[in-house]
Amino acid sequence: MTPTPLTPYLPLAVVLLLAGGMAMLIPQITTRLGPRRPSAIKATSFEAGSESSGPARQRFAVKFYVVALLFIVFDVEAVFLYPWAVNFQALGWFGYVEMLVFAVTLVVGLIYIWKKGALDWES
């Protein structure tokens, strides 16, 4: 067999096909072969050992979403900082200045949201 540009990806394609097949096959097998014994007690909701009270859908305060978005922003910053730190010497001053601009932009954004009161939990 003559190697083609896609030959190195053949094992990956086989693994992906097998994983996809198993992901479809296993739920089908359990659905068809598993026991079905519905009862009233199984249909009730259960929450931490006590009966649930109130509606299942409740509104969350916006501050939770703001904190979650800030976490994602600074988590992405950490993802960008790692490769930069690994290649710090190879990048030289240009890489240093680029990362400095990136970090300063994030710090300015943090100061802005701090001044706007987005991190003030009591308000």
Curated annotation (Swiss-Prot):
One of its GO terms (molecular function) is NADH:ubiquinone reductase (non-electrogenic) activity. It is an enzyme of class 7 (translocase). Its main location: membrane. Belongs to the complex I subunit 3 family. This is NADH-quinone oxidoreductase subunit A. The chain crosses the membrane at residues 6-26, 66-86, 93-113. The gene is nuoA. Gene3D superfamilies: NADH:ubiquinone/plastoquinone oxidoreductase, chain 3 (1.20.58.1610).
